[in-house]
Amino acid sequence: MMEEKQSHYLFGIHPVTEAIRAGRKFEKILIRKGASGPQFTELLKLAEEKELPVQFVPAEKMNSLVRGAHQGVIAYISQIEYVPFEEMVEGALSRKAAPLFLILDGVTDVRNLGAIARSAECAGVDGIVLPAKGGAAINAEAVKSSAGALLRVPVAKVSNLKVAMFYFRDSDFQIVAASEKAEDDMYDVNLRKPTAIVMGSEGHGISEPVLSLCTVGARIPMNGEIGSLNVSVAAAIILFEAVRQRR
């Protein structure tokens, strides 16, 4: 099991630094808490320039992930090829009049991410937008949970979701906040237009800065007492409402 896990990581300060310089993409980089020195300073500088998420963790956690001399640095290897955000949007607009995109704001569970991607692929979504920081890593478990959909649906990572949302708005997309607090039922929202649907985090929903840039809200009507659905289930429901409207 350890050997299988290690195929998903690159470790050692020099190999990781050189891989970043060469343009290798990583989901995130783990650095041992308390690590210091010029090599670590250089690594952090490169990671910031390339907008790669960095997390400081105890040595015990790092030792549990890989066998060998990791030197306080472990990088998660990206399991997919990301596409440039603007290229993804413009490509979809060149192919169809009303593309459909999904924006995930703070979805951190890899299994939820995989399930959402699976539904998105089945619904014919033109792309998924993820934040570079604060979201689930697309690791082997996420790809497996997606039944391979993450290898088929275009995925873009952006350093700032708000910038991406302004781009959608400038491109005449409506941005739909999927929220139980929305005033309108999803059945009353016209999803036949060029649309980007925003799904929020499992615990807190859509963040206020992102919510403020949405142009319309859509609520999934429910009759039970709990009042909320798992984010992957909610995403599937609203995506297939868009499919129904577009038939």
Give the label of every model feature segment.
Residues M1-G91:
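N-terminal positively charged helical leader segments and presequences
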Residues T17, A22-G23, E141-A149, E208-R247:
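Structured adenosyl-cofactor binding patch, chiefly the S-adenosyl-L-methionine
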Residues E18-K25, E90-D185:
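RNA substrate-binding interface of SAM-dependent RNA methyltransferases
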Residues P58, S78, D105, P131-A132, ...:
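Short beta->alpha connector loops at strand-helix junctions that form conserved
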Residues E60-L65, Y82-V83, L161-M165, D184, ...:
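A short acidic, often aromatic-flanked loop/helix-cap motif at beta-alpha or helix-coil junctions
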Residues L65-S78, S146-A149, V158, R192-G200:
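Short basic, glycine-rich beta-strand/loop surfaces that mediate nucleic-acid
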Residues V176-S232:
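Active-site/ligand-binding-proximal alpha/beta "capping" segment
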